[in-house]
C-alpha cells in the first residue's frame, strides 16, 4: 500500500518546470562552470572578508519547440517583398533578418523604417491563419502615419485591420476577436492585456515604433513582459533612429524587448549613403556680446566668496566663477542630502551653498546661450523671491543674503533694464544670425519653403518669434510651437506679502483686508483682460497667448495645418517638435541651442532631407560646440561597439519550422480603393476617422451635429484572466488539497476518497421534529394525519396584506362546545388615532358565512387589495375590517415579518393602547435579538403545540354553525407530552424557531 508521504509529495521537477515556464514552447538549459580563483588570506590562513574563492560561469542554452500558432503551410514556401517602391539593399537585408528573429532596426530618419515593418507584417499575415499582428506607436499622429504607410504598402484588406486608441472601449472585445491587424498605442495594448480582452497567446507579430522609449517601466516594457509570461512564439520588430545614448542604455532596450539582432545604419554606411538626400551642415560660432561679458564678470565677482567657501568645504570643484555649472551643483546637493553620516546642521549649510551655485549656474547658462532678455527674467524673479522672503523673516539663509544683497547685483539690474528699454536692442548674437539666415534662405528659395528653429526654453522661443517678426518683412511668417503645459508663473511679491502680513484681530481690519483682496483680484483680472486684448492686436499675439496658456492638441493640429498650407513658413519649436509629429517637409533646420544628448541632436537634424535636399544650421556659443562634438563622437563610438557585437542578445523563436526556408518573391502589390483613399489623406483625425469607419464596417458619412443619446447598457462580458496551460482555473477548496487516511482493522492507513469521506453528524432534537416550521399549513397537515375525520371540503382563503396573496387554509379547528368571541371595532371616525379595538382580549363574535360565500366574495378582495388605509387614516377600511372579523381563526394567524412600528399614533403623539404597546415591545425585542424574549417565546410555543397535539377530538366547521360570543374558554391546564429532559434540551439549544 502506498505510504502517506507518496500522497503528499511535491511535483516532479519536470512538472514544476512546466508550470514555471507557463507551458510555453521555450526551454532553457543552464550549465554552471566553477573555477577556483586565488584569494588573499591573513596570517592564520583565513580568507579575508569579501573575497570570492570560486568563479562561476553560467551558460544558458535556449531552445524552442513547435509554435502553437496555426500556420498556412501553402504560403510558407516564400515571402513577399513589395516592389511598389524602389528596392533598396539595406531594406531588403533587414526585412529578411527581421522575419526570422527579433530585430532592433536603427536607421536614420526618413530611410524607410515603416516599409520594413509593413513588409514583415504582411508576411506574417500570410503565414498565419488566425494570429494577431500589432503595430504600436506612442502618439496618435504616429499611429495615423503608420496606418497610411502600412495600408498603402501592403494592401492588407481594411476589413481585417483595426485602429485602437484610448478614447473609447466600445466593442473592444469584439474587435480583438474578429480582426487580425491592429494599430494602437502601447497604453491601449497594455490595458487590454491586463483586462483580459486580448489573449497574449494570439499575438504572432509585434512592431514597436520609437523603441528607444522602452526603458524602465514604460508601456512598451510592460507589454513585452506580459506577453512573455504566456507566449514565446512571436516576432518582435523594434524601430528607432537612435537606440540610446550609451552602451548601457542599448543593453537595457535589448533586454526589455528580447532583441536577438541589431541592424544599425548611419548616414555614412556604405549601403545607405547612396539613398541619402544631401544635408548640408553649417556650424556657426557666435561670440558673446560685450554687454553679456560685462554681466558675467559682475556675477562672478558677487558669487566668488560663496564659490570659494564651497571649494574649501570640498563640496564643489575648483573653477572660475564664470564656469559654474548648474547640473554639477545639483548633483552634489543630491549626494549630500542622501548621505546620512553628515550632521544635519552641516548638511543643510552645504545644501544651501550648492543651491545658490545652482541658481547662479542657471543665470550664466541663460546669459551665454539665450541672451540678456531670457537671463533678466530669471534673474529678477530669483532676486525678488529671496529678498521678499528674507525681509518678512521667512528665510534666514545668510549665505544667499550675502549674494542677493550684494551691491553689484543692483548695478546688474539697472544695466539690464536700460538695455531692454531700447526696442532695437538685440539680446544675443544668435538672434542676428537667425535673421540673416532666414533672409538669405527665403530670397533664394521663396516663401513656399519651410523652416524649423529648435530651442529648449519657451521664453527663448517667444523671443525668437518676436524678433523675427520685428525685423523681417511679410515674406517670413513665424509662429511658436510648444507643449500643452501652462507657463510657470513668476513670483508674485504683492500676493506673497499680503499672505504673510499680520491679519489683524478686529472685525474692521478683517473686513478691510477682504475688501482689499477683492479689489486687487479685480485689478488683476482687468489687467489680464487688457493684456490679452493688446496681444490679440499684434501679429505675434497667438504665439504670446500660446506661450502663457500652452498649446492643446487642437491648437497644435491647427498650427501644423497652417504650416503645411503656407500660412506660417517658420516654426519655432521646443522639444515637442523633435519627434512624434508629422510636420511635413522642411528645407532648413536651425538649432538655436544644442544638447549633450545625441538622440535629441539626431532627431532634430532628421527633420530635413527626407524627400529633398536640406540644410542644417548649428548655432554655437560658449562651450556648446564642444558638447555637440563630444555627443556625436560618443554616438559614433556606440555604433562601432554595437557593430562589434558588444551587446548580450536574447535568442528568439524562429516560428517557421527549421526545415522550411522561404524564398523571396518580389511582387507588385495592388492597393485597393479604400487603402488608396487612406494613403491620400493628410489630416490625422480624418485618417483615424476613416480607418475607424472601415473597421466597424460602416460607410463613411459626412460629419453631423453631435446629439447625446441615452446609452443602452450592454451586457458586459466577465473579465477573463489568462492562465498557464494545464492548470485548474476554478476555486479549489482547502479540503481537496490534502489526502485523508483512516486506520483500518489491520492497523494500516487507508486513503479516504471523496465518496467515503465521513461527514460529521448533526445532533437532532426529536422534540423539534414537529415544531420545525411555523406555517399554518404544516400545523394543519400534521393534525390531519392524526385524525382522518377532518373534512376536505372546508377550505378557507385568507387575504394577506396589500399583495392580495391567498393561502389555502385546509381546515379551521375548534373544540366541541367551545365558542369564539370577537373584537368589537370602535367606529370613532372623529378620533382615528385611538386604539382600533375596544376589547383587548376579545375574539371575533360570529362566523356567519360559509366557505362558498368566502369564495364568492374573492372578487371584492381583488378590488380592495390596494386600499389598506382609508380616508380617515384608520389602519383598515371598514369593509376590510368586517371581512377580517368574519374570517378570523386563532390557529390560522402567524407573523411572517417584523414590522417597524412607531411609538405613537399617526395623527398626534397619543400613546397606543396597552395591547398595541405590548406588540411593539415584542417586535422591538425580536429586532434587537433579545435572548430573554426569544426563550420566553420558545417556551410558550412549545406549550401551545403540545396542547394541540394532545387534542383527541375535533369538530368540523359547518356552514350553518354559529358560535356564541362569549363562550370561549381555553383550558390552559391541559397536559402536554414533552418531558422535562426534552424541554430543557430545547430551551437550552441555540434553535430559534
From Swiss-Prot:
Please report the stretch or stretches of sequence annotated as the Helicase C-terminal domain: 507-655
Identify the residues that bind ATP: 107-114
Task: Spell out the SMART domains in the cross-references.
Answer: DEXDc (SM00487), HELICc (SM00490)
Keyword Hydrolase tagged: yes
GO terms (molecular function) for this protein are:
3'-5' DNA helicase activity; ATP binding; ATP hydrolysis activity; DNA/RNA helicase activity; flap-structured DNA binding; four-way junction DNA binding; four-way junction helicase activity
Motif position, DEAH box: 209-212
Q: Which UniProt keywords apply?
A: ATP-binding, DNA damage, DNA repair, DNA-binding, Helicase, Hydrolase, Nucleotide-binding, Nucleus, Phosphoprotein
Q: Which GO terms describe its cellular component?
A: nucleus
Q: Could you tell me what reaction this enzyme catalyses?
A: ATP + H2O = ADP + phosphate + H(+)
Show the segment(s) annotated as FKH1-binding region.
Answer: 751-810
Q: Which domain of life is it from?
A: Eukaryota
Any one Pfam family match given in the protein's UniProt record, by short name: ResIII
GO BP terms in the entry: DNA replication, Okazaki fragment processing; donor selection; double-strand break repair via synthesis-dependent strand annealing; interstrand cross-link repair; negative regulation of strand invasion; recombinational repair
Question: Where's the Helicase ATP-binding domain?
Answer: 94-261
Question: In the record, which positions carry Phosphothreonine?
Answer: 776, 785
Q: How is it modified after translation?
A: Phosphorylation at both Thr-776 and Thr-785 is required for the interaction with FKH1.
**Chain intervals with Polar residues compositional bias:** 539-551
Q: What does this protein do?
A: ATP-dependent DNA helicase involved in DNA damage repair by homologous recombination and in genome maintenance. Capable of unwinding D-loops. Plays a role in limiting crossover recombinants during mitotic DNA double-strand break (DSB) repair. Prevents crossovers between ectopic sequences by removing substrates for MUS81-MMS4 or RAD1-RAD10 cleavage. Component of a FANCM-MHF complex which promotes gene conversion at blocked replication forks, probably by reversal of the stalled fork.
Please describe the quaternary structure of this protein: Interacts with the MHF histone-fold complex composed of MHF1 and MHF2 to form the FANCM-MHF complex. Interacts with FHK1.
Supply the PANTHER family for this chain.
Answer: FANCONI ANEMIA GROUP M FANCM FAMILY MEMBER, FANCONI ANEMIA GROUP M PROTEIN
Name under which the protein is recorded: ATP-dependent DNA helicase MPH1
Source species: Saccharomyces cerevisiae (strain ATCC 204508 / S288c)
Q: What is the lineage of its organism?
A: Eukaryota, Fungi, Dikarya, Ascomycota, Saccharomycotina
Gene behind this protein: MPH1
